[in-house]
């Protein structure tokens, strides 16, 4: 492979789910400086649910997105600052403010069959001169061909990179291969592709490797896998595997290993790992950020979180339907034998 992989770190955005969006500014700066020193290409910064995600529904952040973004932008010298925007949560106004605070990349994220809602945000990002990425979440919930058609929409709005996003950590390796082949068949040769994997079936690194084999340009990963559910593809593990495969990248593996174990892992109040609950996410194809919400609701009502998660999968709930976690719990209580 003759290209250099683009490494997109998501520790400070997806990883925010693992700490209930409670990173302090000092912690964000410390992590960003370590990532910058290790030469990752970009660092995504926002509430776990993207710009303006801080809310009753998704969980309130310890700081505003702009406070985190501005602090990280000032702290880094090599990496570019990225952010995430979900239309319907974040607005064009939020995007402009994030750009003013220092974000130079935006990933505009929609459910995998709803790319049409991203047009306004993608067009605005391009007008601001931002590196503009389309982010198709829950990509396991549609066919490769339908996903490719949604990717085409984002490309037509101005996105220059389209991501296959395995939000539920439910894709197998052949699933990833089929989706990238479908995208490559329809997108312009100059349009890049990216992979955002979750580790709920322990396939985060394997799926990222398959994506690269199919021509993927950008790889999302996080230190110690810090992310929703069982986490993302662990950055240090992916880089070690890439190095063993002889793939080019700009990262310092040892620096990433140190940052993962010395800085990030100690912040986890709940281990980011494959266990009964996070495995249920991948098995049932449930949005990974539902985990902490489901665990809290289960504790409140005397239920098992895994039962709630499996039922959410049966009902095909998607990101943004966090309120349904309580509904499912109440329904499960009603079905209990007196």
UniProtKB/Swiss-Prot annotation:
Record field: catalytic activity: (S)-4-hydroxy-2-oxopentanoate = acetaldehyde + pyruvate
Molecular function via GO: 2-isopropylmalate synthase activity; 4-hydroxy-2-oxovalerate aldolase activity; manganese ion binding
Binding positions (substrate): 13-14, 167, 196, 287
Keywords from the UniProt entry: Aromatic hydrocarbons catabolism, Lyase, Manganese, Metal-binding, Plasmid
Catalytic machinery residues: 17
Superkingdom of source: Bacteria
EC number(s) reported in the record: 4.1.3.39
Protein name: 4-hydroxy-2-oxovalerate aldolase
Protein's organism: Ralstonia nicotianae (strain ATCC BAA-1114 / GMI1000)
